[in-house]
Amino acid sequence: GDLTVRYVPGESDSLMFGGNSNWRGPVWFPIAYLIVEALERYHHFYGKDFTVELPTGSGRHVTLQGAANEISRRLTRLFEPDATGHRPCHGSYDRYASHPAWKDLLLFHEFFHADTGRGCGASHQTGWTALVARLVRKS
């Protein structure tokens, strides 16, 4: 049969590798953070004359630092409340947006749904997901 690798934005929908095969679509903070750092370092070397199209197909070109800033902004936005108090990282759990005791709580999930930003996996993954603090500090 045909072998394919499909894009899966959240939890794995396959039993490959025992069901733990969700490394090909979701947002993983350690990888995203390393990409931001790499783009910043390459910008330091190549400077403002080296640009990339962002987003692809848009015709808009930015420096590598600009690309790093955009990725950082997207990552930090996962934790920012909208006008109604909902944060993408909390998905559809209204309690975190409306309940006074919960509305300021941030859960540092293991990984995030690439299309919606909803936190997936362990909700107490304060280790690598806490890298968002470094991104906030840099901005």
Functional labels for PLM-detected ranges:
Residues G1-S139:
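Acidic, mature catalytic/reactive cores of soluble proteins
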